[in-house]
């Protein structure tokens, strides 16, 4: 059977579901079914920041039922736009919550710690 599944994106999958509660119920049932099958799922979701309220998901409910959240994004540093990765949540694992600059090189992925106070538009 299938052991790994990527859904890109949860936003597209759930856009016609009329309420956050129904989205939560659907994603919980999906996660439970996949776990029963022994399938690891990676759900891709667009995130937004609306004023002081930031979400780690499209609908504001996915993060409550997920085991892990890894954020990929862009940040400006000295006039350059850099990619970053941040592990926000990972159940059963101690991890740094800091942002790391992400660079794709011919030798593979390179992660570099970002300076805590060096951010512009963080």
Regions found by a protein language model. Name each.
Residues 74-122:
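Conserved P-loop NTPase
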Residues 1-65, 69, 79:
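P-loop NTPase motor core
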């Amino acid at each position: 059977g299938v052991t790994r599944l990527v859904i890109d994106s949860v936003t597209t999958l759930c856009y016609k579901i009329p309420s956050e509660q129904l989205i939560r119920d659907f994603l919980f049932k999906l996660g439970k079914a996949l776990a029963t099958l022994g399938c690891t799922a990676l759900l891709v979701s667009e995130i937004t920041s609306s004023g002081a309220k930031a979400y780690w998901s499209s609908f504001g409910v996915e993060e409550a039922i997920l085991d892990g959240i890894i954020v990929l994004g862009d940040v400006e540093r000295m006039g350059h736009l850099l990619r970053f990765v941040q592990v926000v949540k990972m159940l059963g694992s101690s991890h740094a919550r800091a942002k790391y600059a992400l660079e794709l090189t011919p030798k593979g992925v390179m992660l570099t710690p970002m300076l805590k106070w060096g951010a512009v538009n963080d």
